[in-house]
């Protein structure tokens, strides 16, 4: 599962996956492969983009059903200095990016070889295979 954190300035891209301990390094390698393929041989298609836009747009009404959710939406308007009618504009904004724009942003911002990994698990079982991947410096925090 992948999500982008809300923030002013740099945003964290979080990729999370529950995996079996003995499959940790293989799962990490697969995540890097999937994103590398996405950036090269298997980029997002027009159909995938259309489905993603439709999914986001169709979920909008349910995102503001509670007072707390609406408060969060209004808070985002203030925090990110958006127009007061931002929530009304949101469906059109979600539909706006073209396939070319999405692919260009992916190339610009998704950098699998620059990621920081946070792995939680049994160190005695996962450390050696993770180091063998060669994804960068490994720091152990206990």
What are these regions (language model features)?
Residues 33-43, 132-141:
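A common structural junction motif
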Residues 1-40, 46-99, 107, 112-120:
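M16 family metallopeptidases and their MPP-like homologs
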């Amino acid at each position: 599962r992948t999500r982008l954190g809300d923030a002013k300035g740099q945003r964290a891209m979080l990729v999370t996956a529950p995996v079996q301990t003995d499959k940790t390094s293989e799962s990490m390698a697969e995540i890097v492969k999937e994103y590398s393929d996405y950036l090269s041989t298997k980029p997002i298609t027009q159909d995938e983009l259309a489905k993603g836009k439709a999914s986001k747009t169709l979920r909008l009404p349910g995102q503001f059903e509670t007072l707390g959710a609406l408060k969060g939406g209004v808070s985002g308007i203030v925090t990110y200095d958006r127009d007061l009618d931002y929530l009304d504009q949101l469906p059109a904004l979600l539909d706006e990016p073209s396939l070319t724009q999405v692919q260009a942003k992916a190339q610009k911002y998704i950098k699998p070889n620059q990621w920081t990994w946070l792995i939680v698990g049994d160190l005695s079982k996962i450390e050696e295979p993770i180091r063998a991947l060669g994804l960068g410096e490994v720091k152990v925090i206990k």
